[in-house]
Structure formats: C-alpha cells, structure tokens
Amino acid sequence: MCRCNRYTRWPIDGLVLSEVKRNVNALCIQTRVPVILWGPPGIGKTMRTQAIARSLKMSLIEQVCSTWDPTDVGLPVISNGQFVRLAPKWAHDCDDNTLLYLDEFSCTPPAIQASALKIVGERKCGDLALPLRLSIAMSANRADQAAGGWDLAAPMANRMVHLDSSLVTEDWCDGMIGGFPDQKAEKLGKGWEALIPAKRALVTSFIRRFPQHLLALPEDEETQGRTWPSPRSWDFLCRLL
C-alpha cells in the first residue's frame, strides 16, 4: 500500500485522507466556522471532536440533539408581563473558549432544526446571546443510518462545512493492539484574521470569472442536506483559506 507523505498532492491512502479532514475539522473550529462530521454510528466521531478540544485547550460542552425538545433551545415563559424564551444552563456555560458539540444532529426533528438555526447562524439560544467567538461542531448519521433520522433542511445545511468520516481498518487494528494516539490539532498562528481581506479579493476574483458558481440552490432532497454554494458559504471559505 502506498504511504503518502505530507507533500503529496493527491493522497490515495485512507490514512492520509483522514488526516486532511481532521485538519480541516480543527481549522473550522478555530476559525469559528460551524462544521458537521458525517459517518456511520460507532466509528469515533465524538472521540475525534473531544481530542481536538483537548489539543486546542478548549472547554467542551456536549449536547445530544436526539433528546432535545423545543424547550431545550428556548423555554417560553411570561416574565414581568412579557413573553421571553429562557436559555438552558448549557447556553449560559458557554464562553469565548468553548467548543459546543451537537451530537446526533441528524436526529433533530425539523421543528427543532428551525430553532437551532439561531444557535448555529446567529449564536443565539432563546433570548440569550451566545459568545460571538463560540465554536460549533456537530456530528450526524445519514437518515437511513440513524434512529429517527431526518435530512437537514437546506438553510441549515448551508450554515456549516460538511466532512465525511470514514473508518480505516488498518488504523483501527493498529490502535486496538498498540493504543490509539491522541489526535493533535495544528494551531492557527496569530493574525490570521488580518489576512481575510486578501482572501476575499481572491474569492471574488474567481466569482467574477465564474458567476454561475456564486449561488446554486439544491434541486432535490438528497442534495439539499449537504453542502452547496451560496454567498454565505463563499464567506466561510474566506476564513478557511
């Protein structure tokens, strides 16, 4: 089997490909671009996210979305004669160094997905403003692999980067025998945000040349729940380049 080094442009080995995705996952977390990791149940999606949080020295708040009901994203009450939505405790525990991990997100019913749009897109839970530097990561199974699974609605799917997680048999066997090494995340250097304007110039130059790629709405249910180009997703790219 060919082992590709870090300079290889076209990796054909499963291990190298998984390392690339792992780095993209960590990059999304550090640039505060929401990211969702897709894969079958039981392959270690949660453990990978926990390892990245440890490596980046971030506090991790985990929520299992399959157990959510609408009150978990804002409990409606009357306070001082006004209607308000109270945020749950986990939302109050978030700070600028928090990684919020939403597990089993594809098991979230459409009604709750609609409420979660504010968490993912606006950093808001109920009437509580979440920290603007809060990082959000999710995991999901395909609808046919999840108990009570749902496809993501197009507006939700467009608010995140989608990564497919795979299982490499050789790596699993090695880990079972010799132990699984903790995954290290490469940290961004200081000043990365100052480079965003130059990246925007690069992206807009591409769109001027190929304007048909600025927006391509999904045409069927199968594609609406995954990544698709929009002004929002191009803005994400400017943070990730």
Question: Where are the model-predicted features located?
Answer:
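C-terminal regulatory/interaction module of P-loop NTP-utilizing enzymes
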Residues: 1-100, 105-241
